[in-house]
């Protein structure tokens, strides 16, 4: 009887120790903290045209838990009732390099808008299977989704290709304030 109690205590101690070590060495716990950063106007003409523009990106790294991270972008001081296309990019300035289109948001009558995207953000990359080159996408940039919407800021600008229909305006906000580094790991 006494040997059974000793054995039960041994197994209980082992279970508690295993659980404790799992909590201490769990890699998910080390990477699960949300982090945020600000975007700035993508160019001097945009900064002049939208002097109150502010955009905040918050990333919730949850890929190890949910299979995806969450990126939340909140902006204000933009053009009212305007749609913007959001991308992860290799570089925050032209020519931008490799990019990934992740979503759109439309501002309200006060120039405020937001978007929440579930995707792999913390480890986003583009891969060229022909060259074998992997390119990390460590920046966030958003463009005017309609080329006509940027005309007050950058008159006569040529349409860019940063939208789902292949035609956009100029870049509005970017993470260029992190150069030469990047805000995403």
Stretch-by-stretch model annotation:
Residues 2-15:
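Bacterial N-terminal signal peptides that target proteins for export
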Residues 4-7, 25, 175:
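Generic cytosolic/nucleocytoplasmic N-terminal low-complexity/intrinsically disordered segments
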Residues 10-12, 22, 71, 101:
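Generic hydrophobic-segment detector
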Residues 21-29:
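C-terminal segment of classical bacterial N-terminal signal peptides
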Residues 30-185:
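N-terminal leader/targeting pre-sequences
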